[in-house]
Amino acid sequence: MLPRLGFARTARSIHRFKMTQISKPFFHSTEVGKPGPQQKLSKSYTAVFKKWFVRGLKLTFYTTLAGTLYVSYELYKESNPPKQVPQSTAFANGLKKKELVILGTGWGAISLLKKLDTSLYNVTVVSPRSFFLFTPLLPSTPVGTIEMKSIVEPVRSIARRTPGEVHYIEAEALDVDPKAKKVMVQSVSEDEYFVSSLSYDYLVVSVGAKTTTFNIPGVYGNANFLKEIEDAQNIRMKLMKTIEQASSFPVNDPERKRLLTFVVVGGGPTGVEFAAELQDYINQDLRKWMPDLSKEMKVILIEALPNILNMFDKTLIKYAEDLFARDEIDLQVNTAVKVVEPTYIRTLQNGQTNTDIEYGMLVWATGNEPIDFSKTLMSRIPEQTNRRGLLINDKLELLGSENSIYAIGDCTAHTGFFPTAQVAHQEGEYLAKILDKKLQIEQLEWDMLNSTDETEVSRLQKEVNLRKSKLDKFNYKHMGALAYIGSETAIADLHMGDSSYQLKGMFAFLFWKSAYLAMCLSIRNRILIAMDWTKVYFLGRDSSV
């Protein structure tokens, strides 16, 4: 019996040992029932993940809530502006309130209007255009990347959000009498015609410029400009009409080839960005709905200088030109247009070769030249000797009429400044500060005039002299330049102090979008533009007329 019992116990012990070895992991605890290091590590990772996942959800929720509240608050502020100070003939202390007339509703004029304390002056804005146009995104509108209504803001809405009452007159300035301080304006409304004269103490000329044709025959009547919102509408209609006309001709027909050739003249930001937008429209939208026709479409960009975008760093210019070559945009530099005909343009390449280029649509996006009003104003003042624009001093005062007329924006010929929104914006904000300071000086002079205390008069005189000495000159700070070059890429030449940074590619494209959203005047415009970009991403461009 004893041997049998011993054998049974030994067999049971061996069986228990085997089962224990099978149930344990390779790395195991010496104590049965307790988790090993690997199990502890797995549970630790799971706990950390759950903790950060919950934190991420909370952060997303609070960020979304804060963003929604901010947008709602901004929309409420824009929709419910506070009560304005009404215009009056004088201040409470008896000082006469001066008349400030602003000609134009572009970047310079609107930047001035937004920055100025309009309760200090009787402000009148005169412009044939009753809205502000966000010009940096204008090249995106003809092909439907951005809707035209998304980049406009009514002048009356902007004026209503200022501290003091602002009068707006939908009219065009015709002439100025600098000696009498009067400006002649003419209505542009078809329903009501009038010509009237407005008196001013200060006149701000911010009438912009028009696209120059360099006196090339045939540009007017054959080319489409891209300066105003009406130009973008005309280009969209012309583009759609040309594509439909081309589709009615058989493949390999010379007329079909001509109609499907789109020529853009001008290698500045406007010309480059429109050419890029047009090629995007062909590659990303028409290729889906009209695949055969889209393969025959050709975009040609013509520039008279050796390279496009000459305000950018050379490395960025090279990047843009290489991208155009990849996207099959025919870039022709050192090419000057000599004649424009209804169906073709004649060019001179490298100063040697004459070439005829047939086109279905021609977009003219070259430099600027003064409008008729600016030319009339130049003729009134002998000191205005530059035919390219109004001459101003370093305080933005018009030469020959320094104490009463200012000029800002594209209508001026300011050496070293590009005719960009950035320059006009800074000029407008600077002028608002100057006008505020001038009113403060006038208030001190009025108090000095009405004071009988010699000590007080002496103190006020010192204060006046000090404030006059602090009327700084205009100091332009170049922040850089941005340009969209197609295929969801952009270039950015940024300047911060003495340092410069060059960005390109997708990151620069996101920066380009963010920068322009930040530059918009209202939260309404920001929302509409962001919605347009989102719509294009998911649904494609809407190019319907």
UniProtKB/Swiss-Prot annotation:
Q: Which organism is it from?
A: Saccharomyces cerevisiae (strain ATCC 204508 / S288c)
Top-tier EC class: oxidoreductase
Query: Record's Pfam families?
Result: NDH2_C (PF22366), Pyr_redox_2 (PF07992)
Bilayer-spanning residue ranges? none
- What broad taxonomic lineage does this protein's source fall under? Eukaryota, Fungi, Dikarya, Ascomycota, Saccharomycotina
Which catalytic reaction applies to this protein? a quinone + NADH + H(+) = a quinol + NAD(+); a ubiquinone + NADH + H(+) = a ubiquinol + NAD(+)
**Function noted in UniProt:** External NADH dehydrogenase required for optimum cellular growth with a number of nonfermentable carbon sources, including ethanol. With NDE1, performes the mitochondrial oxidation of cytosolic NADH under these growth conditions. Regulates the mitochondrial glycerol-3-phosphate dehydrogenase, GUT2, also involved in cytosolic NADH oxidation.
| SUPFAM superfamilies named in the record | FAD/NAD(P)-binding domain (SSF51905)
This chain belongs to which protein, by name?
External NADH-ubiquinone oxidoreductase 2, mitochondrial
Q: Sorted alphabetically, which PANTHER family does this protein's record hold?
A: EXTERNAL NADH-UBIQUINONE OXIDOREDUCTASE 1, MITOCHONDRIAL-RELATED, NADH DEHYDROGENASE
Residue span of the annotated presequence: 1-21
Encoding gene, per UniProt annotation: NDE2
- Write out the GO MF terms: NADH dehydrogenase activity; NADH:ubiquinone reductase (non-electrogenic) activity; oxidoreductase activity
Report if keyword Oxidoreductase is assigned. yes
Q: Which UniProt keywords apply?
A: FAD, Flavoprotein, Mitochondrion, NAD, Oxidoreductase, Transit peptide
So what family is this one in?
A: Belongs to the NADH dehydrogenase family.
InterPro entries per the UniProt record, alphabetical: FAD/NAD-bd_sf, FAD/NAD-binding_dom, NDH-2, NDH2-like_C
Just give the chief location class.
mitochondrion
